[in-house]
């Protein structure tokens, strides 16, 4: 399983890919990618990291993760 630092890095990389499409698409695209392609254990671990303050997460990535909690 990936460490929280590795997951933060991966999530931020995904977010940076979508950032050029504008803030709303950055959030939506990042959320959709994580929802579709991340293993449930990875999602649980990044959510634990978010609960602990989410250090290192890009604001758009943080918003994407928060949006997934509302689903």
Go through each PLM region and give its residues.
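Amphipathic, hydrophobic secondary-structure cores in small proteins
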Residues: 15, 21-51
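N-terminal acidic leader/helix
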Residues: 1-23
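Short, charged early-sequence alpha-helical segments and their helix-coil boundaries
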Residues: 42-68
């Amino acid at each position: 399983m990936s460490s929280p630092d590795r997951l933060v890095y991966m999530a931020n990389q995904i977010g940076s890919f979508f950032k050029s499409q504008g803030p709303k698409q950055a959030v939506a695209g990042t959320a959709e990618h994580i929802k579709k392609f991340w293993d449930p254990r990875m999602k649980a671990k990044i959510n634990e990291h978010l609960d602990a303050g989410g250090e290192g997460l890009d604001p758009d990535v943080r918003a994407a993760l928060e949006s997934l909690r509302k689903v």
